[in-house]
């Protein structure tokens, strides 16, 4: 998916040379796709752990994410006002107590997206954005 904060902003930097940040103070929890896959494997291999667990390890503001990207991609950051102050924070201490440890961080994801885009493996297609895909298939109207 390219419509979650880290992926979306990284692709903006790579394809437009500019990151547009709406607000910037909103917090988002982050987890690398490899780590979320490892969470599932961890519970399959450790069935004694049951219940509901949060899986998110880096609660970072959108503005901080943009700065992290700008440290790896030659881009400018444009901050625009936003009327959406929603922030989401996740505490994953319960998950960590089961012995699970994440292996990757947001900076790893930025670097991987950058490398995949520059090598031609990743392209900026509508099918990687949920709302664009749903509108294309007449499941949602963006207007």
Give the ranges of each region predicted by the language model.
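C-terminal substrate-binding subdomain of Rossmann-fold SDR/epimerase-dehydratase oxidoreductases
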Residues: 13-17, 21-143
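Flexible, glycine-rich beta-alpha linker
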Residues: 1-4
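Anionic-ligand binding region
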Residues: 9
């Amino acid at each position: 998916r390219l419509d979650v904060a880290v992926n979306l902003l990284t692709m903006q930097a790579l394809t437009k040379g500019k990151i547009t940040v709406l607000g910037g103070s909103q917090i988002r929890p982050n987890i690398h796709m490899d780590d979320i896959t490892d969470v599932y494997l961890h519970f399959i291999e450790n069935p004694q752990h049951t219940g509901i667990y949060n899986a998110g390890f880096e609660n970072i503001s959108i503005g901080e994410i943009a700065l992290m990207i700008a440290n790896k991609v030659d881009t400018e950051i444009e901050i625009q006002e936003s009327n959406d102050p929603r922030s989401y924070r996740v505490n994953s201490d319960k998950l960590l107590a089961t012995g699970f440890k994440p292996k990757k961080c947001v900076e790893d994801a930025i670097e991987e997206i950058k490398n995949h885009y520059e090598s031609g493996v990743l392209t900026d297609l509508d099918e990687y954005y949920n709302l664009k895909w749903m509108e294309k298939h007449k499941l949602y109207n963006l207007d």
